[in-house]
Amino acid sequence: MSVLPRYLLPDNSEVDETGRLSIAGCDLIDLAMEHNTPLFVYDEDHMRARCQEAVAAFPDGVAYATKAFLCKAMAQLAYEEGMDLDVATGGELHVALEADVPADRLIFHGNNKSMRELVAAIDAGVGTIVIDSRTEIAKLQSILAASDRTVRVMIRVNPGIEAHTHEFLQTGATDSKFGISIDGGLAKKAVDQVRSIPALDLVGVHAHVGSQVFEASSFARAVEVLADFIAQIDVPALSIGGGLGVPYVEGEAAPTITEWGRAISTALAGTGLRVKMHAEPGRAIVARAAVTLYTAGTIKEIPGVRTYVSVDGGMSDNPRPVLYGSGYEVFLARATSADRTLEVRLVGKHCESGDVIVRDGSVPGDLQLGDILATPVTGAYGHTMGSNYNMVLRPPVVFAKGGDARLVVRRETYEDLLARDLG
């Protein structure tokens, strides 16, 4: 097995002469000793650079998809770098507002927004609400009936594109819980319905073909399909959503944000349509910015079968392998550049046989109990999809920058586990 590919590490990663890895000047083993493990370590300047790249790639407007990773510090960072924020629940809306992101810089998504969530968004002054169904149109009409307010809205449509990704990550196909299908005239009926309501200001159309998509052609095809629809309804803006994939394991490759934006702009120019083009990257901003640190607690060799390495985290801090069969790499923080000769299965501490972090991984042959193991590219959909299964404590998050590590989310305590328990 080869050494860990450096392109899977955060931008500001350095390996010293002994093989120890630092991120933004912060030694990972030192961070593990200070904060214990599991621990998420983010390269702050990496995320800022990706935000800046996204703003440049989509000058008409770009929003950070907070579902990928959200805390107050992340919301502030994305806003400071010129991005709007895409929120999809009342909780994400609340965190963004608590981070002092102006409400008019928020785009409110979700396929089943409750009346309470819609009222909260409207009262806060959210910039745009993305309508996901005709049911939602009726909800908005009811809320605004006795008001003189006008709400900016987009309509999420399904272009009928089946992107090459995991079934659970396909969101633009006709058979999807999200959006309103263009086929059969359903989206056109929704447009007509919105335009019949004076309180709703239709400013564009939104679509999302899927997540973890490696082929820019999927997005280009969506633009072509959507352009035909937009030409019929005459709206000023099109949002292509997010979904740009990132490499997680050796051998994978994906377009950069700049290349993604260029492919979409080229496709739009080819249609002859003159509209503003928006996008909503999330994973592409944060995934490679972080690594997760664990401590090796058990090494179990089954002769002729495999070696299991159990760590102090698992599906509670990274459920993606269980949900999607996602692959990850693993390495030793003290020997980042070492040849990985020992084949292992990295597993968590939960009471589930499926609690696997890295199914077919490799580490240096001198792995020892107590070693700090790291999995790269864990900045997206780890922290936000985490849980308290088995009543484990959710890990802390640090932002590393210029040799300083700032604790932005503390580790939970046992008292936190009982905070909602009324006995």
Where are these regions (language model features)?
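Structural preference for beta-strand elements that scaffold enzyme active sites
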Residues: 61-63, 82-84, 105-107, 128, ...
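Charged (often Lys/Glu-rich) extended helix/loop segments that serve as interaction or gating elements
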Residues: 274-423
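A generic secondary-structure signal marking the coil-to-beta-strand transition
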Residues: 11, 19, 38, 60-62, ...
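General structural feature for long, well-ordered alpha-helical segments within catalytic domains
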Residues: 27, 43-46, 50, 54, ...
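Short glycine-/acidic-enriched loop or helix-start segments at secondary-structure transitions
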Residues: 74-75, 96-97, 118, 140-141, ...
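Active-site beta-loop-alpha junctions enriched in small/polar residues
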Residues: 46, 67-71, 88-92, 111-113, ...
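Active-site loop/helix belt of alpha/beta enzymes
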Residues: 2-3, 143, 160-300, 363, ...
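A charged N-terminal "starter" segment
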Residues: 1-152, 188, 195-201, 403-423
